[in-house]
């Protein structure tokens, strides 16, 4: 092992720059095993997608079933809304509303039908098409897999604590010789890079697998470029690469079973796991953690059921066939101005589409346990990450028509675009509806106060309108909250599983509170996503900031700066509707979320309150009630920082000094 002590000895430490850190980085790395990764000519492809190995013979039937169910539910919701709006005729603005409602109901229907299918599958005895069985004996591997941990200005101690836990877990399976671990750093901050190298020095001394550290001088291509650089330098030495994020955690058993599945299915290009969220401490993080654990698997299982060999990639916690990736996933600079041109921002969905175009199958592993990640701790960090993903998905719009893509790959790209485009559609739909309602002749004649409405209630009631409105509300409720309720029913149907959620009462209470909070947060996200799309299309694309993974408080100043415009908008709308009670009543759930944007942001980021909820069993998950061994092992010191080192400004900082994130 290379001697690195001079970097950290107090007597020889000096103020350093990132270039100096890179030049002085003498960590041993393996001999390069180059693998060509040519840039793909995205617009030049002869014919359609190459044929891939299908593991399920009735996939076309499944997709027809899903399509018919989605259309039926979407039409039912749209027809109920039409019956409500069309009483007395349809104005031009109401026609706009009805037009915008169509894609909204179809998207909700797809979400509901996918979850319903997943629920039905999970209520039976499902078998993994890939043959991944957690009850089977541990397989013996015959290939080598590289575990890639890309980092960018992260908390080095936390990253290496997770790596140490994964390394130990792999060793327990007896397969340490089949896995090498690479920390591939794109860190731009010299002091963070020094911290990474200090942690690596200890990790390498203790590791069971071969472990390596590489820092790039230029972070060309961001994460996709980071992985591509590794592939081009060392890819031919490894049959597979298991791609992680800095907050990823996977058991050794899960990694071994993924590698075994790749060995048994040589036509598989990628297998994506479903990471469960762990370590949530704030109210916001714990709510996401609870919701994902409770009902995420019904949607995930349904998605796996109808996507088959044409699934998608989430960018992490997935295993990839290295040769297939190198052959098909060299990403070019996209032509044209931003936001559509330049570096590919959201690479994962495009990479899975290119893999499938090249004849490699892309799968989900819906029944594999042992895959984890963490979530943003507050709504501000969630919105920041969401904006970055939004830009990446908008960039996919012209890529949907790329020649040679499988139609399912195009559908995944469309779903990604719609996940953000639905927010402005909802916004414009609501705006058109409110303007239309405000201009109705009945409201022009008189503005009813609450007392006037109560006194004249009997005369104003139109039972046909109430019936139509009730049906529209019921169908919308089922489409929105049905998957969550199905997830709870699944837990209740499985003996002993409800204990992991704190018991029936606590699970029901958590479900109710989560549904309320999600209903309040939805209008806020509608505003933030709509604004993000407008700014991105206007050319304000933003940079690549490091993620804050441990923020446990948002003060009023920060919350107001980010969300104050939403609260003000809600207050203005509420004041405008005060003398039109029907509008105020109809929009109350949306207005509540807007008005409370600032306090909800502050409350959601509260760590102490989140831990109190945990102590009382609210939002409990099985991984919290009985933490898996790897989750327990990933908590704790993973490195011994030097007594002091120096930042760029020459001031010494110690191990307890907070590391500054680079913008």
Swiss-Prot record:
The chain crosses the membrane at residues 65-85, 104-124, 415-435, 472-492, 507-527, 559-579, 583-603. It is a multi-pass membrane protein. Its EC number is 2.4.1.-. Its main location: membrane. Keywords: Cell inner membrane, Cell membrane, Glycosyltransferase, Membrane, Transferase, Transmembrane, Transmembrane helix. PANTHER family: CELLULOSE SYNTHASE CATALYTIC SUBUNIT A [UDP-FORMING] (PTHR43867), GLUCANS BIOSYNTHESIS GLUCOSYLTRANSFERASE H (PTHR43867:SF5). Involved in the biosynthesis of osmoregulated periplasmic glucans (OPGs). This is Glucans biosynthesis glucosyltransferase H. It comes from Caulobacter vibrioides (strain NA1000 / CB15N) (Caulobacter crescentus).
């Amino acid at each position: 092992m290379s001697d690195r002590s001079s970097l950290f000895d107090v007597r020889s430490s000096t103020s350093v720059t990132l270039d100096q850190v890179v030049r002085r980085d003498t960590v041993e790395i393996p001999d390069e095993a180059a693998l060509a990764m040519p840039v793909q000519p995205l617009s030049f492809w002869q014919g359609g997608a190459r044929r891939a190995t299908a593991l399920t013979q009735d996939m076309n039937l499944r997709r027809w079933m899903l399509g018919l169910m989605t259309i039926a539910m979407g039409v039912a919701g749209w027809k109920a809304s039409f019956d409500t709006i069309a009483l007395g005729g349809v104005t031009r603005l109401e026609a706009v509303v009805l037009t915008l409602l169509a894609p909204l109901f179809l998207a909700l229907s797809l979400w509901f039908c996918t979850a319903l299918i997943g629920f039905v599958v999970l209520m039976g005895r499902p078998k993994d098409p890939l043959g991944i069985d957690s009850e089977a004996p541990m397989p013996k591997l015959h290939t080598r897999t590289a575990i890639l941990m890309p980092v960018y200005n992260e908390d080095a101690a936390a990253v290496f604590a997770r790596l140490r836990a994964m390394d130990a877990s792999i060793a327990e399976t007896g397969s340490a010789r089949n896995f090498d671990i690479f920390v591939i750093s794109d860190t731009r901050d010299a002091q963070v890079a020094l911290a990474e190298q200090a942690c690596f020095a200890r990790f390498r001394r203790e590791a069971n697998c071969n472990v390596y550290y590489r820092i790039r001088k230029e972070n060309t291509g961001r994460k996709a470029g980071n992985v591509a650089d590794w592939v081009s330098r060392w890819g031919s030495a490894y049959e597979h690469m298991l791609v992680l994020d800095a907050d990823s955690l996977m058991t050794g058993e899960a990694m071994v079973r993924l590698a075994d599945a790749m060995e048994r299915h040589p036509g598989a290009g990628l297998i994506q796991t479903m990471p469960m969220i762990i370590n949530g401490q704030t109210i916001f993080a714990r709510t996401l953690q609870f919701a994902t654990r409770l009902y995420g698997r019904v949607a995930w299982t349904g998605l796996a059921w109808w996507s088959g060999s044409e699934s998608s990639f989430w960018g992490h916690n997935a295993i990839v066939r290295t040769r297939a990736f190198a052959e098909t996933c060299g990403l070019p600079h996209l032509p044209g101005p931003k936001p559509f041109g330049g570096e590919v921002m959201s690479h994962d969905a495009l990479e899975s589409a290119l893999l499938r175009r090249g004849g490699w199958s892309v799968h989900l592993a819906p029944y594999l346990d042992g895959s984890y990640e963490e979530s943003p701790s507050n709504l501000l960090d969630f919105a920041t990450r969401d904006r970055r993903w939004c830009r990446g998905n908008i960039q996919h719009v012209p890529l949907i028509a790329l020649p040679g893509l499988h139609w399912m790959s195009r559908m995944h790209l469309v779903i990604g675009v719609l996940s953000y485009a639905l927010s402005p559609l909802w916004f414009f739909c609501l705006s058109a509806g409110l303007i239309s309602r405000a201009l109705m002749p009945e409201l022009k004649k008189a503005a009813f106060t609450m007392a006037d409405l109560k006194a004249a209630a009997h005369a104003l009631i139109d039972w046909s309108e109430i019936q139509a409105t009730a049906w529209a509300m019921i169908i919308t409720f089922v489409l929105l909250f049905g998957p969550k309720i199905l997830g709870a029913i699944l837990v209740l149907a499985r003996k002993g599983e409800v204990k992991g959620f704190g018991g029936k009462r606590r699970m029901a209470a958590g479900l109710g509170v989560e549904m309320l909070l999600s209903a309040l947060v939805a209008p806020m996200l509608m505003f933030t996503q709509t604004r993000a799309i407008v700014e991105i299309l206007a050319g304000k694309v933003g940079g690549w900031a490091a993620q804050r993974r441990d923020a446990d408080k948002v003060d009023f100043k920060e919350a107001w700066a980010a969300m104050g415009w939403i609260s003000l908008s809600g207050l203005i709308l509420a004041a405008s509707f005060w003398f039109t009670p029907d509008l105020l009543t109809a929009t109350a759930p949306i207005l509540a979320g807007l008005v409370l944007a600032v306090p909800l942001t502050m409350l959601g980021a509260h760590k102490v309150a989140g831990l109190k909820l945990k102590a009382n069993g609210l939002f409990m998950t099985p991984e919290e009630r009985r933490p898996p061994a790897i989750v327990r092992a990933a908590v704790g010191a993973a490195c011994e920082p030097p007594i002091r080192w120096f930042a760029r400004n020459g001031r010494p900082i110690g191990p307890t000094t907070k590391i500054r994130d680079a913008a």
